[in-house]
Amino acid sequence: MRVSVSKIGTSCAERLLNDVNVWARVRNDPLLTILTAKMPLRKEYRRWFDGIEEDKPAAGADTSSLRIYLYLTKPKRSRGGRRNVHITAVVNGAHAFCLLSRMGAEKSPLGGETFCIRVSKSKLCPTPLEDLPDPRNEPVPSQILPADYTSLTSKAIPPLDPEWCVCLSPGAWWHYPTETVFFFHLKDIMKSICPAGWNSMTFCAILTAFLDPKPRNCDLRRDTRRRHVDQFGNTDGPGAELFCPCKVPCHNEDGPRRTPLRPRGEQNLLKLLFVGHVETVTQLQHACEPGYIPGDVSRVIRGNGADGRRVPPNCQAWDLLKFTQFASRSLLCGCPEMRRIVDDAADSSWLRSGE
C-alpha cells in the first residue's frame, strides 16, 4: 500500500471530517477505536489530495466517492484536564493525515455501531508513513441502514414559512429554516395498487415512473446508481437510492420544462396520481427552483384529459411527511445532486432577498 501525506490544512481537515454525518465503528479495542465512512468525492476534496482516485469497492459500483478510515487513540490528559483524541485518517487507502483534536461523539439515531462525531480545536501532527495502519485489513460495513426509512420521518403540515425552500423534485423540498426535507409519500392503504415488487413510495419516484419509459437515463447526473453514496450505513452500496428525493422526470425529449408531458411509463400508477385518465401532465414546481410546500399535491402537478379538461390529482393518496434533521442531513451528505441544488439555492439572489 503506497500512501502519501496529504497537504490538507487544519481547517480543511476538520471540515472534511465534520462533513460526514454518520460514522460506522468497525473495531473497538481498549487502546484503539476505528471508524469508517463513505462520502461523495466533491471538487474541493480533489484540491486537498493530490491525484486522488475514486474509491473502487469490491462490488465494482461506479461511484465517485471517498472511503475514510479513522484510527482514534487517546493520549494523556492535558493540564486543563481535557482529553484530546489523536486521529490518523487514511483516505481511499492512498492519502493520510494526523490530527490532535477535541472530539464530541454520540450514538446516531440509527443505532448499532453508528456514531455522529464533531472535531474542533485541532492541530496537525506529523504523519509517520512507516507506521501507518493498512485499512485493507479492516472490514467494510455491510448492514443496510435504516431498516425502515419511515422510522426517520413524521407526518407534517406545511411550515409557517412554506416559501423558504428549494424544490428538490416534484413533491419534495429542502426547507432552509429547519434544515429538513419535506416530501409527499404514498399512504399505506394505497400501496396495494402498486405493481408487484414496487418498493419506492415517494411521490417523485412514482411520478417519474409514470411519465418516463423504461429504461431511460437521458441525464447521467441524475443516474442514482452512479451518484448516490450510503451516508447512513457507510456500506459500498447506493444507500438511500429508494427514498432519496432526487428523482425527476426527464424533459430532454419533451421540450421546455413548462411543456405538458405525455405519460410514457408505468400506466398502472395512474390511479395513485389522478382521479381519472390523463393525456398530459404539467409540473407546477421544478427542481432547482424556488418552491412552496403545500398541504396536498394539487400544487405540484396538473392533469388534462383528452378533451383538454382538467383532471384533479388524487390528493387523498398522499401524506406530507418530513425527515428528521438527522436523516435530512444524511440524504444531503450522500446525494451530490441534492447537495448542489441546496447549495446553489442558498447562494442565489431569490433566497437572499427574503432575509
Curated annotation (Swiss-Prot):
It holds the Pfam family Herpes_UL16. One of its GO terms (cellular component) is host cell nucleus. Keywords: Host cytoplasm, Host nucleus, Late protein, Virion, Virion tegument. It is found in: Virion tegument; Host cytoplasm; Host nucleus. It comes from the Viruses. Its main location: virion. InterPro entries: Herpes_UL16/UL94. Plays a critical role in cytoplasmic virus egress. Participates in the final step of tegumentation and envelope acquisition within the host cytoplasm by directly interacting with the capsid. Upon virion binding to target cell, a signaling cascade is triggered to disrupt the interaction with the capsid, thereby preparing capsid uncoating. Belongs to the herpesviridae cytoplasmic envelopment protein 2 family. Interacts with cytoplasmic envelopment protein 3 and with the capsid. This is Cytoplasmic envelopment protein 2. It comes from Psittacid herpesvirus 1 (isolate Amazon parrot/-/97-0001/1997) (PsHV-1). The gene is UL16.
